[in-house]
Amino acid sequence: MSRKGGKAEKSELKNTGFSAEQEQRAYRDMLLIRRFEEKAGQLYGMGFIGGFCHLYIGQEAVVVGLQMAQKEGDQVITSYRDHGHMLACGMDPKGVMAELTGRRGGYSKGKGGSMHMFSREKQFFGGHGIVGAQ
């Protein structure tokens, strides 16, 4: 790709099929996931999150792209790195964090932790351990 002044030439830019608004929303979603996971990592290090806490840092674009490609009625089930999926499908960050920290306001009333929460409303059916699940 040739560059002029650090930008791609107009002839090299590809139409993504998404509007500027959709692309901005995708960026905001990726940023939300990154910041959420950074905070979850801090809380885990401080002992506020028990059990395991498998972070989604570095994979934000994957789940946001997946959500952008889904059609009405599609459902998601994932492996143990699932916080990004929860946030990208529209689950409330406060509810997800409440679950991670074992509070009753969490999606599984604080009993599911990092890997075992779900939202029927958002068509998200949880994260599952790798043994025998994949």
What positions do the PLM features span?
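Conserved acidic/glycine
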Residues: 1-62, 68
